[in-house]
Design a protein with these regions (language model features):
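Post-transcriptional modification and biogenesis factors for structured RNAs
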Residues: 1-146
Length: 146
């Protein structure tokens, strides 16, 4: 499952839905407000994945995480200050939380995650586009499960 904490760019949302499909995620969860909706741009960028990948809109992301935790899911959020994703065991039922393009994962959502994961980087720039970060982390989760 991929949860998006206020992703605003419809191109990012479409690319993430496409990634969710190719890594066989169960779906994508987005907030009802303060984020990109399911627009024609999202559909086009998803390259058709929007037709096969469930997308749920929720009112409260934190409450959604808490409810899914009660059903046995664990949550890992992407953050530059986290533990290297290669050091985490992400083989079980994982919800991958990706934050807003400018602000990252909100404080309350981050506090409800079980792990905070970072993507090791070498260059002068220390951040990735939200959809790229989603792809890198989603493929690490998939790799661990193979």
């Amino acid at each position: 499952m991929i949860l998006l904490d206020n992703i605003e760019d419809p191109h990012n949302l479409g690319a993430i839905i496409r990634t969710a499909n190719v890594v066989d995620a169960h779906g994508v969860i987005i907030p009802k407000r303060r984020a990109s909706g399911l627009t024609a741009t999202v559909a086009k960028t998803s390259a058709g994945a929007i037709n096969y990948t469930p997308v749920a809109k929720v009112t409260n992301m934190t409450k959604t995480i808490q409810e899914l935790k009660e059903k046995g899911m664990w949550f890992v959020c992407a953050d530059m200050a986290g533990t290297s994703m290669y050091q985490l065991d992400m083989k079980g039922p994982i919800g991958l939380v990706i934050g807003n393009e400018g602000d990252g994962v909100s404080k309350l959502v981050k506090e409800n995650c079980d792990f905070i994961a970072s993507i090791p980087m070498k260059g002068e720039i220390n951040s990735l586009n939200a959809s790229v970060a989603t792809g890198v982390m989603a493929y690490e989760i998939l790799r661990q499960r193979l």
